[in-house]
């Protein structure tokens, strides 16, 4: 009996150890960067990923993030993340601090997605929207492309793409990425959507690059709480670094076809967030507006 008990305890301990080890093994890597397509950078990263496991699926989120624009990288991850299956591995390379002491991390969200990225603010909107369960520091002694130790300017290929591939292929567990972070992630401050003094306030988080519509972070629930109605008219003001750049009265509509060509309208975009457009025009270009954490918007009932 004592021998049987010891074997049981040993097996039970191994079971607990194995069951607490989290493997992604989704076989999916979603890749975004500010590299563009004019050189071989994107192809190099993909080559590294396929070299780890040829069966991996690589999806390009975008490689047209404006150079060094960490905020837009954060937004595009937030935009795409909810449509991917659990355990998918995102790798984001917008890394103006490459080769410095900024941290290289893998974050696991509460909804079971993995994000491989420099800890430079890229995780801001992922954390706010989905919550980050754990962050691990990438152990570069173990998870770095062979022969790249003297390369200091392409962590996207040598560390991030390589680590993402190993995680997605199930070659390493999340715990094997490296030690748990003992510091909070770097976050970019911005105006959260609120109703304050009977005014709806938020941030212009992104532009629709094709059509020039401006998208805010003001969601459908807050719009309903404020009492916005179809065909209602509202005073809209836009500020950049606290300087007013736009002011006009705009009507709220369900879709573009509810207005005449050239008319401005407030509407709910595909993410059910408040947006502004010019019907068959480019609102942002027309009014010289942009997006980011320093672009604020207010909506007020007439």
Q: Where in the sequence are the language-model features?
A:
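N-terminal signal-anchor module of multipass membrane proteins
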Residues: 30-37, 42-43
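Active-site histidine-anchored catalytic micro-motif
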Residues: 27-28, 40, 52-58, 68-75, ...
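Alpha-helical scaffold segments in soluble metabolic enzymes
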Residues: 44, 48, 76-79, 125, ...
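Anionic-ligand-binding alpha/beta catalytic cores of soluble enzymes and soluble regulatory domains
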Residues: 148-230
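N-terminal signal peptide c-region/cleavage motif recognized by signal peptidases
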Residues: 19-21
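A conserved acidic, glycine/proline-rich C-terminal tail/linker
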Residues: 214-289
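A residue-level signal for conserved active-site and pocket-lining positions in enzyme catalytic cores
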Residues: 34, 163, 279
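Bacterial N-terminal signal peptides that target proteins for export
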Residues: 2-13
């Amino acid at each position: 009996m004592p021998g049987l008990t010891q074997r049981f305890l040993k097996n039970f301990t191994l079971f607990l150890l194995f069951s607490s080890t989290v493997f992604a093994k989704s076989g999916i890597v979603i890749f975004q960067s500010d590299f563009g397509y004019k050189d071989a950078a994107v192809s190099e990263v993909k080559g590294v990923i396929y070299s780890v496991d040829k069966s991996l699926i690589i999806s390009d989120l975008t490689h047209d993030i404006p150079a060094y624009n960490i905020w837009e990288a954060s937004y595009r991850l937030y935009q795409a993340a909810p449509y991917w299956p659990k355990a998918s591995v995102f790798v984001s390379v917008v890394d103006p601090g490459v080769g410095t002491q900024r941290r290289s991390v893998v974050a696991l969200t509460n909804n079971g997605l993995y994000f491989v990225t420099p800890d430079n603010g890229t995780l801001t909107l992922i954390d706010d929207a989905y919550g980050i369960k754990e962050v691990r520091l990438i152990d570069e002694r173990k998870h770095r492309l062979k022969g790249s130790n003297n390369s200091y300017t392409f962590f996207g290929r040598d560390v991030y793409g390589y680590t993402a591939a190993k995680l997605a292929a199930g070659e390493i567990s999340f715990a094997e990425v490296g030690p748990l972070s003992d510091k909070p992630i770097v976050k970019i401050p911005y105006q959260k959507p609120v109703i304050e003094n009977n005014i709806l306030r938020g941030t212009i988080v992104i532009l629709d690059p094709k059509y020039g519509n401006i998208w805010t972070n003001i969601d459908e629930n807050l719009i309903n709480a404020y009492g916005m109605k179809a065909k209602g008219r509202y005073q809209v003001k836009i500020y950049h670094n606290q300087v007013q750049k736009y002011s006009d009265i705009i009507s709220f509509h369900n879709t573009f076809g509810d207005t005449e060509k050239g008319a401005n309208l407030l509407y709910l975009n595909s993410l059910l967030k408040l947006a502004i457009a010019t019907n068959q025009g480019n609102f942002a270009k027309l009014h010289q507006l942009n997006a980011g954490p320093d672009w604020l918007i207010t909506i007020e009932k007439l």
